[in-house]
A protein has these predicted regions:
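Cofactor-binding active-site loop characterized by glycine-rich and histidine/acidic residues
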Residues: 1-110, 128-138, 142-146
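Short internal beta-strands
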Residues: 111, 116-119
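Short beta-alpha connecting loops at secondary-structure transitions
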Residues: 120-127, 147-152, 194-205
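Electropositive phosphate-/nucleotide-binding environments in soluble metabolic enzymes
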Residues: 5, 9, 53, 154-161, ...
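Acidic, glycine-rich active-site loops and adjacent beta-strand->loop/helix elements
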Residues: 1-3, 90-96, 106, 118-124, ...
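Conserved phosphate-handling catalytic cores of large alpha/beta enzymes
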Residues: 124-134, 138-176, 188
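Short coil/turn segments at beta-strand junctions that form active-site/ligand-binding loops
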Residues: 84, 112, 174-176
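Glycine/aspartate-rich loop-and-adjacent alpha/beta segment that forms the canonical ThDP
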Residues: 14, 170-217
Length: 217
């Protein structure tokens, strides 16, 4: 939601999808909430996605492949000197899925202009990291030669903003893939049907890493 608000969507836009209203700007009330797709002229484009965890990695990497192809063939549009960058937003647990491995393999091999933004809150719906993966996902992603990985404190707004600006600038100029791994707390519920109180004993610790009070200091 924060990314959507950051690109210019309004809280009303998001609530229209939650309540499946016909004026929902993403799908006219047809898709599940938090499943945006967008083709507004004045905003970044968001391709449609399904609910399968991690599946967004392949189509977004495909978009980056298409951008590279157009550039190599001399067919690319002029965006005022700013080369386009594709962003794939992922959760840390989704990085265990096969689709993510396939996407990273091709992005590394072909050097696509894409940024994989991984929000790592240490949880996979209701299972913690130790129950779902053998290692920190950055160790796995660093195994793909040609993909640069940066790990940051995702609760530090200034650091996040600066890092993403630097990464975007590099990808626009050098046309190569990045992974930005942001360590964040899980503050809310996964969904209204999977409530945090049922399975978590780290709520007080997570609250100490809430980025909102830090931003207001």
């Amino acid at each position: 939601d924060s990314i959507l608000l950051g690109i210019g969507m309004t809280p009303l836009d998001l609530m229209l999808q939650v309540f499946a209203k016909k004026d929902d700007p993403f799908s006219g009330g047809r898709t599940y909430y938090s499943h945006p797709s967008l083709k507004d002229e004045d905003k970044p484009k968001i391709i449609h996605q399904s609910s399968a965890t991690g599946m967004q990695a392949i189509p977004t990497t495909g978009v980056a492949m298409g951008i590279q192809y157009r550039e190599l063939q001399g067919l690319a549009e002029d965006f005022g000197g700013k080369n386009p960058v594709v962003v794939c937003s992922l959760g840390d647990a989704s990085c265990t899925e096969g689709e993510v491995s396939e996407a990273l393999q091709m992005a590394a091999l072909k050097q696509y202009p894409i940024v994989y933004l991984v929000q790592d809150n240490g949880w996979d719906i209701s299972a913690n990291a130790a129950e779902t993966r053998a290692q920190d996902m950055t160790k796995y992603m660093r195994g793909f030669n040609g993909v640069e990985v940066k790990t940051i404190d995702g609760t530090d707004f200034d650091l996040c903003y600066q890092t993403m600006q630097e990464v975007f600038d590099t990808v626009r100029k050098e046309r190569r893939p990045f992974v930005v791994h942001a360590k964040v707390p899980l503050l809310g519920h996964h969904t209204s049907g999977v409530r945090k109180e049922w399975y978590r004993d780290d709520l007080e610790e997570a609250a100490t890493r809430d980025p909102y009070p830090k931003l207001l200091q």
